[in-house]
Design a protein with these regions (language model features):
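Structural signature of multi-pass, alpha-helical inner-membrane proteins
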Residues: 1-155, 187
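Alpha-helical transmembrane segments of multi-pass inner-membrane proteins
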Residues: 19, 26, 137, 141, ...
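Internal alpha-helical transmembrane segments of multipass membrane proteins
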Residues: 136-176, 180, 246-255
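Hydrophobic, glycine/alanine-rich multi-pass transmembrane helices and their short helix-loop junctions
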Residues: 153-156, 242-290
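Hydrophobic transmembrane alpha-helices and their membrane-interface caps
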Residues: 162-214, 272
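Transmembrane alpha-helix detector for multi-pass membrane proteins
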Residues: 193-213, 239, 243-250, 279-286
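Helix-loop junctions and hydrophobic alpha-helical segments within the transmembrane domains
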Residues: 221-241
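Conserved small/polar residues in nucleotide/adenosyl-binding loops
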Residues: 302-308
Length: 312
């Protein structure tokens, strides 16, 4: 399937690499600034606390619910629709180890009955602060481990300059996606962490395809200009990149629109991550590899000195 028919023309992607790197640097700096100044809106998974899911017989008035909870000592409550307009999820910060989740849940229900007698408790969940801290550390460790493994694999499978470019693109995607959640104040929980790991996998897959084509052209094409070969490789893989991205984005848009509040953050992270991952696989990974000195001679030398499966 072809979206673009270029008639053998090579697009000069790398002519814009300095502009692209400047744009990426600006986004990364803005993301870091927001993360360090504003911070992340960590969810119950990381902060600990109590989540109470309640149901109404009619669509819930979130503004009224927040007002009633504030009047009854729950001013810090986070209230959002959960699955339907009649179900809401109330998230509360930890209130001391001596206060049981059931007690807090009953207090929330009692307060909400002042606004609507039909309210019923669906579910109550408690996460201790120490558990939340452990999950935060383990989540960060999982992401770091994934990046290290990717660096080792790409360096072994291709060439170390490609590995640096691939990991640079992945770090770029992770930082900017996390920065988006910081800027917008969206809740960051385990589902968002899972989405970011999925974005890493998606972006890596695209980067590997491009890197493989660049390596192949370095060996086959009788051109010594590194930039020209990279442009040629990016052009040859462009249709594949666009088809993969567009089909993925269409599914994610459907998930974002009709998936409900439960997976809204997950869909947001994936949707933005696919956009930024597609961009980074074209501009960031290749630009970093060029900066690190990737060349036809380096790749050909690696190919000649490392035995293939047939030689072994």
């Amino acid at each position: 399937m072809q979206i673009l028919s270029l008639g053998g023309k090579t697009l000069r992607f790398m002519s814009l690499r300095k502009v692209a790197m400047g744009f990426s640097t600006l986004l990364i700096l803005a993301s870091f600034a927001s993360i360090f100044i504003k911070g992340l809106n960590f969810g119950l998974d990381f902060t600990g606390g109590t989540a109470v899911e309640v149901g109404f017989s009619q669509p819930a008035d979130l503004k009224k619910v927040r007002s009633v909870l504030a009047e009854n000592g729950f001013a810090d409550a986070s209230v959002q629709l959960f699955g339907s307009s009649q179900d809401i999820l109330v998230r509360l910060a930890p209130r001391g180890s001596e206060v049981k989740a059931e007690v807090i849940g009953n207090q929330v229900i009692t307060a909400l009955k002042q606004a609507d007698e039909s309210v019923v408790m669906r579910r109550i969940e408690f996460v201790g602060p120490s558990v939340g801290e452990d999950l935060k550390e383990q989540g960060g460790l999982a992401m770091l481990t994934a990046l290290i493994c990717i660096l080792i694999y790409v360096a072994f499978r291709f060439e170390w300059r490609f590995a640096v470019g691939a990991v640079g693109a992945l770090l770029h995607d992770v930082i900017i996606t996390v920065g988006l959640f910081s800027v917008l104040g969206l809740e960051f929980d385990l589902t968002i962490l899972a989405a970011i790991l999925a974005v890493i996998g998606y972006s890596l897959n695209d980067t590997i395809v491009v890197s493989d084509r660049i390596r192949e052209n370095f060996r086959k094409v009788r051109i010594d200009d590194t930039i020209e070969i990279i442009d040629m490789s990016l052009t040859q893989t462009l249709n594949r990149t666009l088809v993969t991205s567009i089909t993925t984005i269409l599914v994610l848009i459907a998930l974002f629109v009709w998936g409900g509040q439960t997976i809204h953050g997950f869909a947001t992270a994936l949707l933005f991550g696919v956009f930024i991952g597609t961009y980074s696989s074209v501009y960031v990974a290749s630009s970093v590899a060029i900066t690190m000195g990737v060349s036809k001679e380096a790749v050909s030398y690696t190919h000649l000195t490392l035995p293939t499966n047939r030689e072994v």
